[in-house]
From Swiss-Prot:
The gene is aat. It comes from Escherichia coli O127:H6 (strain E2348/69 / EPEC). Belongs to the L/F-transferase family. One of its GO terms (cellular component) is cytoplasm. GO terms for biological process: protein catabolic process. PANTHER family: LEUCYL/PHENYLALANYL-TRNA--PROTEIN TRANSFERASE, LEUCYL_PHENYLALANYL-TRNA--PROTEIN TRANSFERASE. This is Leucyl/phenylalanyl-tRNA--protein transferase. Functions in the N-end rule pathway of protein degradation where it conjugates Leu, Phe and, less efficiently, Met from aminoacyl-tRNAs to the N-termini of proteins containing an N-terminal arginine or lysine. Its EC number is 2.3.2.6.
Length: 234
C-alpha cells in the first residue's frame, strides 16, 4: 500500500481498499476541490481532510463511522429540552453562514479553510451540499452541513453556540430524513460526541456496499427545498 499522488488532469481515485492502515484511511494527496472531483470522491466513499498549509489529503477509513437515523440516541434531558425548545430549525436557508460557523467555532483550529468553504459552497449551488440551521429568534446559533448521496447523507461538520443547538439540528434532520426515505448518515470517523449520539463503526467494505446501493436511491424531489422544519411552540 502506498500513498497515491492525484493528477490535476483527471478526477479518478484509486480504490479505497488501497488506503493506508496508518494513518488509518489515508488514500491519496493532491488534486483539487472542484465539484466534479468532490462528487467523484463521495461516490467512492472518500472525503478530503487536511490542515491549513498541507496538501489536500483524501481519506477512506476502515472502520467507518455511521449513524442509522432511527438509532439516534436522545437523552431524557434532551427530550425534555426539545419539548420546550426555543429554537426554529430550517433547511438550506443559510448554507454559507453554517459552514462559516463550523469553520470559526473550533478553538483548536479547523480544516475548513477558505478554499474548502468556497468548494462546498459551489457544491451547494449545484444542489449537492445542504445545511440545517438552528435559530434563536433571528440569530443563527447552530447547524450542520453535508453532502447528499441519494438516501445517504454524508455529514461533514456541525457547530453550536447555544445549549443543545447542534443536537437539535441533528434530531430534527433525522426525523425529517427518516420520514422521507433517508437511510443512513455517514459520520466518517467515530469520536466521543458522535458515539454518544448513537453512531457506530462498521467495516469499510460494508459502508461501500451501502453507499453503492443508497446513492442510487431517491428522496422526494422537493426534499432539499429551503423550508422550515421545526418551530417553537407558542
Amino acid at each position: 500500500m502506498r500513498l497515491v499522488q492525484l493528477s490535476r488532469h483527471s478526477i479518478a481515485f484509486p480504490s479505497p481498499e488501497g488506503a493506508l492502515r496508518e494513518p488509518n484511511g489515508l488514500l491519496a494527496l493532491g488534486g483539487d476541490l472542484s465539484p466534479a472531483r468532490l462528487l467523484m470522491a463521495y461516490q467512492r466513499g472518500i472525503f478530503p481532510w487536511f490542515s491549513p498549509g498541507d496538501p489536500i489529503l483524501w481519506w477512506s477509513p476502515d472502520p467507518r463511522a455511521v449513524l442509522w437515523p432511527e438509532s439516534l440516541h436522545i437523552s431524557r434531558s434532551m427530550k425534555r429540552f426539545h419539548k420546550r425548545s426555543p429554537y426554529r430549525v430550517t433547511m438550506n436557508y443559510a448554507f454559507g453562514q453554517v459552514i462559516e460557523g463550523c469553520a470559526s467555532d473550533r478553538e483548536e483550529g479547523t480544516w475548513i479553510t477558505r478554499g474548502v468553504v468556497e468548494a462546498y459552497h459551489r457544491l451547494h449551488e449545484l444542489g449537492h451540499a445542504h445545511s440545517i440551521e438552528v435559530w434563536r429568534e433571528d440569530e443563527l446559533v447552530g447547524g450542520m452541513y453535508g453532502v447528499a448521496q441519494g438516501t445517504l447523507f454524508c455529514g461533514e461538520s456541525m457547530f453550536s453556540r447555544m445549549e443543545n443547538a447542534s443536537k437539535t439540528a441533528l434530531l430534527v434532520f433525522c426525523e425529517e430524513f427518516i420520514r422521507h426515505g433517508g437511510k443512513l448518515i455517514d459520520c466518517q470517523i467515530l469520536n466521543d460526541h458522535t458515539a454518544s449520539l448513537g453512531a457506530c463503526e462498521i467495516p469499510r467494505r460494508d459502508y461501500l456496499n451501502y453507499l453503492n446501493q443508497m446513492r442510487l436511491g431517491r428522496l422526494p424531489n422537493n426534499f432539499w427545498v429551503p423550508r422550515c422544519l421545526f418551530s417553537p411552540q407558542e
